[in-house]
Each structure stands twice: as structure tokens, then as C-alpha cells.
């Protein structure tokens, strides 16, 4: 994944009308969507849509260095790619590869990660089995550039991906394997005969078909290692590096990969990011949120900090910011995959754990308005966002409150108004709230004793039978 300084990050702490984040994406979002035809895949997709909140874990050699993922070995000139200008590119790249001999996460405990995520209200995980640098966090037989051949090789937990997947399954997560299609360590992708001027393969596939076929086979076999049952049930195959695609002359033969994956893992969701078609079972806008409600399945992947992996100086979003982001995404019909970067020793930063605890406190009281919901045609009125239970017809209004400000005495919204005689329940307290309706405007008197700093207050009601309330 790519770090890009976008308007979303710049606006994170500002009080904006409606509190909607900017619609700027780090990668181009697919403009078309193709629904899966396999009923089992559709069923898995529906179950995934119920989960709403997941954890994306970036962890690897870049964590040891405390830098922005593996992008520093890409020679593109970008201000977000850090590299010591006093060191030649080739020398830097050699030093980066050598980090395999230093990465030794002796406090690695993925069960603690899973418990922290569960306390935060997360229900699925996507773990980086291999980022663009090619360093595998699983026991691959296709390359020696893996955690099984570095400083951690003699530790019983060396097959990190297996430990992660097992730990998260024990906490009842849906489990996803992140896998980078580009591999900058592979001589079949970056051939050492030539310079490596960009993230893309550095030779002509047309002139060197054998070499690219070797890369396709290498990619197929690595994915097969993750899919063949050695790592248990995998619910999502999350493929990054969308510039490796047929439309850019770099096919890895996705039909063959998908057939193999579903042969081992029936009904697995396949997410070939930003490549529209049958192998992108849901879309993944990065670092942003679509401007409008979308009925196709989608997920915004957004880091808790500025970076995906661990950077010691990173600045993290507040719990209120994350909750506001989650509320907006769910009201528009999507899921939030929140990026978390463990430290090189294998522990989560204390600031991350503290924020996850606070997010979980709010979801513990108000999660009914988030989980197992779907979006409504009228999904928003200023700072109020609306959702509906997937079953049963219950409606929800979630009013996002100004961070750092006293809780108001009353809140109001237009649209999705309960009809006279309906009961409105404040989810935070579980009690009936006093409300009035004038025309299409609902005004609710907030109950006393709400926690200071509450980021949002949610209400539920049942529509009266046979009556339309969405006016």
C-alpha cells in the first residue's frame, strides 16, 4: 500500500460542515463493479458486509527501520518516500535487504493483537503476508527472503502468518491474507540486469516472456502455499499492487489463481484491488471515503496514523475521529479497515492500544447502529448519519458531536423521522429519549449523565407498520 499526503489527512482535525472527509484516494478507485455469480461467494460477501470494522496489519522489515512500509527501496522520487540522500540507491537497497538479519520480534504475541482488536469492536483482519519488498512472513518454499530464514528463524513462532491467522480465528474474526502482486526482491520482477526506475517490472515482457512466466509461476505457488490449508481457513485474499494487471501488460493470470484459491478455499472473497471485474469482490478506496452512498460492496482502508506500518514519530487519529469516519462509511454502505502497525518487537504501540480501547467503549454501547446494518436512501443530514438493520426494519440516527466541546442539550435532524407515537431509544443509555417532530424535523432532548467527550450519540426506533417514515 502507498502513503500519500491527501486532503483527508490535512482536514482530520478541522471542524467541517457535516464532518465528511475529503474524497481523495491514494489509488484510483474502480469505476465499475461486477457481482459474484457463485451463491457461496455472495453469502460470504453478505456476511462480510455485516462486520463493518476490521484491522489491517502492516508489519515487516520496514517496522524494524521505522519507515513507511517497503517503499524506500522504490527509486521513484516522491516526498513521502524517505531515503538518506548521502547513500547511493544501490547501497541503500542492499542495506534494506540485510534487515532480515535484524528483524527479531521476540515479544511477538498475535493473541494480544487479536484481543485488542476485539475490545475495539473489530470483526475481521487482513494481515500482510508479503509486502512489495518481497519479504514473506510465512513459510514459503519459493524464496529464502522470508522470516523463516532471518534472525527469527529458530523461534517456534517464526511462521508468523500462521500464528496470526490462528490467533485471530480463536477470537472469531474473519481472516484475510494481504499479498503483494509486485515483488521487488524477485529477479523475475526486478531483473538485476537493468536498473529499477519505478515500482513496475523493469524489463520488456514481450521480449522476455520466459522471465515473466517464471514470475507468474512464482506468484501462483506463493499464493497456493497460503491457500492450500496449511494456514487454515482463509476468508479473504486481498491482493495489493494494482499496477500489475493485464491492462498494463502485466498479467499474473488471475483466472488461474482464483480457480486454485477457491479449489482450496470455497467461497473465499478475492479482492484484486483497483482491477475491476470478477476478481474484485469488493472495492477498496484507500485513505478516503466515496462522496455518496454506494450500493456495491466496498471498504475504505485508512490508517490509524499517517503511515500504515510502525513509525516512532507517527501521529495517530483520536478515537472520536475514527468513530466519525466509521459512522460515515457505514451510513454510505461500506466497511472500515483500520490500519495498525505493530512495533518491531511484536507489540502494539501503547497509544494504539489506548485508542482502540476508547473506540471499543463507544461501539460497546452503540454498535447496534453499526453492525449488521445497511445504508438508507436518505443517509445523512449534516452531522447526523442514518442506518437500518439488515433484518427487522429498525432504523438508526447517529449524531456526530464536536470533539472537545460540551455535550449539547438537544440535537436535531431532518429526514428518517419517526412517526408520532413512536419510541426513540438512546443506545448509550438504553432508555427512551424525549423527542418532538415538527414537519420533517426531529428534535431530541439528550438524557443527563452522558459521558463527557462522547463522540457521537445514536438513537433507534421501529417504523410503524405500513407507514413511510423516510420523508
Predicted region positions:
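Mature catalytic domains of secreted/periplasmic carbohydrate-active enzymes
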Residues: 23-471
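Bacterial N-terminal signal peptides
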Residues: 6-15
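Residue-level detector of intrinsically disordered/flexible regions characterized by low predicted structural confidence
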Residues: 4-5, 333
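Positively charged n-region of N-terminal signal peptides that target proteins for export
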Residues: 1-4, 117
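Intrinsically disordered, low-complexity segments enriched in glycine/proline and serine/threonine
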Residues: 5-6, 133
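Sec/Tat signal peptide C-region and signal peptidase I cleavage site
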Residues: 16-21
